[in-house]
């Protein structure tokens, strides 16, 4: 069976998908390279919000946490519990990775509904949530793939690849393709849900600009949080699976 060509074709498909565009986009030209300016600008805004919130909340840590410090300690405890549940007792080193994924996606998703991106004019296109662009979701999914490959190899060494011939060598092609389709499912799930939510709100606002869009926006905030949780949970589950063996 042509397993290697098939895997190479799958990776090429992921690269091609990262170039998919919805609507017009604004680029920065740096030499011979085009930089996707919209994604970078909105991602920097999200990162600034996260870093600024953390700095403000813990700039004066107290033995008995109050207000912002208490909130971030609760968030950290939640992420630790999530990581431990999905990865197991060796979850500790992966808490920063899972936490970063969850918080970045969560704030990115909410920024699409809460921040007035549309009022900022660009030469081409318009600003939107970072996760509204498939380049962002594919990048996050590929980072997750690299993480679970690293987790498996660091735990088991080259014996990690034995999982591809279990329970029978006949399943080798399917087991290989499974690892390359995980990024596809993660990226499309997140991208599709966030894009659909923003499109629904835009359509309703254009049709009934006053009352009707408000409940839909609240529903969008709820589903955006759920999508961040699903992505982080699946990322942790994939890492745990690579460390424990193929199920």
From Swiss-Prot:
The chain crosses the membrane at residues 38-58, 95-115, 134-154, 199-219, 220-240. GO terms for molecular function: proton-transporting ATP synthase activity, rotational mechanism. Coiled coil: none annotated. It is found in: Plastid, Chloroplast thylakoid membrane. It is a multi-pass membrane protein. GO terms for cellular component: chloroplast thylakoid membrane; plasma membrane; proton-transporting ATP synthase complex. Its main location: plastid. It holds the Pfam family ATP-synt_A. Gene3D superfamilies: ATP synthase, F0 complex, subunit A (1.20.120.220). InterPro entries: ATP_syn_F0_a_bact/chloroplast (IPR045082), ATP_synth_F0_asu (IPR000568), ATP_synth_F0_asu_AS (IPR023011), F0_ATP_A_sf (IPR035908). Keywords: ATP synthesis, CF(0), Chloroplast, Hydrogen ion transport, Ion transport, Membrane, Plastid, Thylakoid, Transmembrane, Transmembrane helix, Transport. The keyword Metal-binding does not apply. Key component of the proton channel; it plays a direct role in the translocation of protons across the membrane. F-type ATPases have 2 components, CF(1) - the catalytic core - and CF(0) - the membrane proton channel. CF(1) has five subunits: alpha(3), beta(3), gamma(1), delta(1), epsilon(1). CF(0) has four main subunits: a, b, b' and c. Belongs to the ATPase A chain family. This is ATP synthase subunit a, chloroplastic. It comes from Lolium perenne (Perennial ryegrass). The gene is atpI.
